Amino acid sequence: MKKYKIIMTGGGSAGHVTPNLALVPKLKELGFEIKYIGSKNGIEKEIITKENIPYYSISSGKLRRYFDIKNFTDPFKVLKGVMDASRILSKEKPDVIFSKGGFVTVPVVIAASMKKIPVVSHESDLTPGLANKIASPFCDTLCVTFPESLKYIKDNKGKLTGTPIREDLLKGDKERGRKFCNFKENKKVLMIIGGSLGSKIINESVRKILNEILKEYNVIHLCGKGNLDESLKNLEGYRQYEYISEELPDLMALADLVISRAGANTIFELLALRKLNILIPLSANASRGDQVLNANSFEKSGYSMVIKEEELNSELLLKSIKDLEKNREKYLNSMKMSKIGNGVNNIIDIIKKSAHM
């Protein structure tokens, strides 16, 4: 019986890596041998090696939308990356490549195309990121998460699959989460997720109105690295953490309402878990504007309340929390009606087909 092999790639941020992990259990169940290609120093190396998946490093230049002197040297790093990836692919002879985006994927996808190895890519955001835009001509299929994304994909390569969500995230234990936080009072739980680096403006806005919030809620605040406030360490009902990984499913199960950035992976997890949410997307000035588009789509569908970062202040945040609670059933019903589910099975079907399984 033929042993099938897949090489996965994606990196630069956790959002380009964790969706890969959501596919791993199913791929293993199907008998796929899994290898990974990432950068030498990216976050993907730490995440993937913890999962005991064989990891290859390649050279990769950063893709920028702005002028930088490195724009003249990085194409040579990409070229070296293509040669690095080509050697790995010649050695491993995979049946299919799965690419999750991030600049490290571009050399891998180009090398795979040159060797006629099928490439399945996935884009979480509403509009394709720069890496997926560049890699798109070399892909066979580009899986997307939002129905609106299909209009941006050329040559009929786009497939609406949804985003892959880790099974363990959907199986959190509320009581285990409560025990972990050790809340004394049995109130509703408000959770704030500012991303792995945190958000200064969200952290400050929340902390200014903590006393008001704590009248109604226990608070779990994922504030990002280096953003703990020591003066609030012993405040009853308030738990702050720089970052949570292992316990996240339990804390998500415990949360009644979530305030979050609008990265695609996070918001689709909130939708899958049917969590009331307020989204504060990273402004277009500080990014390519993908979070603004993601949030607008969710607001239009009735899944989320949205506050623009430029308009955020403590008073507006407190008012929005109260308004969301008043309209709780309306938002929950919209989420229940959503036909967008976990994308794992849809993507696995495309991978199997591409590998001629």
UniProtKB/Swiss-Prot annotation:
- A GO biological-process term: regulation of cell shape
The source's domain of life comes to Bacteria
What metabolic or biological pathway is this protein involved in? Cell wall biogenesis; peptidoglycan biosynthesis
Look up keyword Cell wall biogenesis/degradation and say if it applies.
Answer: yes
> Which is an annotated GO molecular function term of this record?
UDP-N-acetyl-D-glucosamine:N-acetylmuramoyl-L-alanyl-D-glutamyl-meso-2,6-diaminopimelyl-D-alanyl-D-alanine-diphosphoundecaprenol 4-beta-N-acetylglucosaminlytransferase activity
Membrane topology listed for this record: Peripheral membrane protein
Please name the top-level EC class of this enzyme: transferase
InterPro entries, from UniProt? GlcNAc_MurG (IPR006009), Glyco_trans_28_C (IPR007235), GlycoTrans_28_N (IPR004276)
EC number assigned by the record: 2.4.1.227
Catalytic activity reads: di-trans,octa-cis-undecaprenyl diphospho-N-acetyl-alpha-D-muramoyl-L-alanyl-D-glutamyl-meso-2,6-diaminopimeloyl-D-alanyl-D-alanine + UDP-N-acetyl-alpha-D-glucosamine = di-trans,octa-cis-undecaprenyl diphospho-[N-acetyl-alpha-D-glucosaminyl-(1->4)]-N-acetyl-alpha-D-muramoyl-L-alanyl-D-glutamyl-meso-2,6-diaminopimeloyl-D-alanyl-D-alanine + UDP + H(+)
Primary site of residence: membrane
Q: Give binding positions for UDP-N-acetyl-alpha-D-glucosamine.
A: S13, A14, G15, R166, S196, Q291
**GO cellular component terms attached to this protein's record:** plasma membrane
Keyword line: Cell cycle, Cell division, Cell membrane, Cell shape, Cell wall biogenesis/degradation, Glycosyltransferase, Membrane, Peptidoglycan synthesis, Transferase
Q: What is its subcellular localisation?
A: Cell membrane
The answer on whether this UniProt entry bears the keyword Membrane reads yes
Name the family.
Belongs to the glycosyltransferase 28 family. MurG subfamily.
Purpose of the protein: Cell wall formation. Catalyzes the transfer of a GlcNAc subunit on undecaprenyl-pyrophosphoryl-MurNAc-pentapeptide (lipid intermediate I) to form undecaprenyl-pyrophosphoryl-MurNAc-(pentapeptide)GlcNAc (lipid intermediate II).
Record-given protein name: UDP-N-acetylglucosamine--N-acetylmuramyl-(pentapeptide) pyrophosphoryl-undecaprenol N-acetylglucosamine transferase
Q: Which organism is it from?
A: Clostridium perfringens (strain SM101 / Type A)
